[in-house]
Design a protein with these regions (language model features):
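Acidic (Asp/Glu) and glycine-rich low-complexity loops/linkers
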Residues: 4-9, 24-135, 139-155, 164-173, ...
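Generic hydrophobic alpha-helical membrane-segment signal
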Residues: 11-13, 51, 145, 166, ...
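Bacterial N-terminal signal peptides
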Residues: 11-21
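Short helix-to-loop capping/linker segments positioned immediately adjacent to catalytic or ligand/cofactor-binding
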Residues: 139-142, 159-163, 179-184, 201-203, ...
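Short, surface-exposed interaction patches in beta-rich subdomains
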Residues: 171, 182-275
Length: 275
């Protein structure tokens, strides 16, 4: 082999092999249309993985990372940002029911030791969202306005579910189990069901609905600001607190235990007293 050719060929070949290795390490086992990845040798440096996804309409998370959802009129997608080791631990797939399942391949108590779990972020987008199920320690944040027919939210872990922008839907169901929190900014719906079991907190900054059923069982807190709502039924079991304020057409309260249902800031527009 020509020596000049050998000297120029070998570095190029090694560079090509290195680039192929980096791309393979970045890939997840799930099928995808496109991949963009940037990996570096230092496992604590930032890595970004982007992929287009097939259509999905629900999210289920199990892991110690934060998920940010955006409703879009474009194709569904996922983007993961964080340290290389953390990013490569994230797994995802879309099941036959259209649920995007996001988890971690190697999660244990010491996985984020010495690092902030909030530095691992998963950004997802889809035209529709009808359900959120979270069983991990991370947060799920809906960062865009959301318009949907039916939305079911289930939080079974220690993380939070947060809506930063208005939510419009026909039916809304929110269930919290454990120590997690739910924060909804502005909700407009026909019927709403809010349930809290445990020691978590639920806050609805503004709720306008024809009918709302609110139930608390445990030591948690539910705070709801009502905006010209229809009928509100509130039931409390245990030592928790339900606080209702704003304006409604009718309200019914039932309390079992030593907890408190505070209606001192609630105005019933028909002149009816809370009962």
């Amino acid at each position: 082999m020509n020596k000049l050719f050998s000297k120029s060929f070998m570095p190029a070949m090694l560079c090509g092999m290195l680039c192929i290795s980096v791309s393979c390490n970045s890939a997840n086992s799930n099928s995808a249309n496109t991949i963009e990845a940037e990996n570096v040798a230092n496992p604590t440096s930032k890595t970004v993985v982007k992929r287009k996804l097939a259509y999905y309409k629900a999210i289920r998370t199990t892991g110690a990372f934060d998920v940010y959802f955006t409703q879009t009129n474009k194709a569904s997608s996922i983007r993961i940002e964080g340290a290389k080791e953390d990013v490569e631990s994230v797994t995802w797939n879309i099941d036959k029911n259209g649920v995007l399942n996001i988890g971690q391949r190697t999660f244990d108590r010491n996985f984020f030791k010495g690092r902030n779990r909030h530095e691992l972020k998963v950004y997802v987008a889809s035209p529709d969202l009808i359900a959120i199920t979270s069983t991990g320690a991370g947060d799920v944040k809906v960062v865009s306005a959301l318009d949907t027919d039916v939305l079911r939210i289930e939080q079974k872990g220690a993380g939070d579910v947060e809506f930063e922008k208005p939510l419009i839907c026909d039916q809304l169901f929110v269930s919290l189990y454990g120590a997690g929190d739910a924060d909804l900014n502005k909700v407009t719906a026909q019927t709403v069901q809010l349930e809290l079991y445990g020691a978590g907190d639920m806050d609805v900054n503004s709720l306008r609905a024809e009918k709302a059923d609110i139930k608390l069982q445990g030591a948690g807190d539910i705070d709801v600001k009502l905006d010209k709502a229809g009928t509100v039924n509130s039931t409390l079991y245990g030592v928790g607190t339900i606080e209702l304020e704003g304006t409604v057409n009718a309200v019914n309260v039932k309390r079992f235990g030593s907890g408190n249902i505070d209606t001192s800031k609630l105005r019933v527009m028909t002149g009816q007293r809370p009962r």
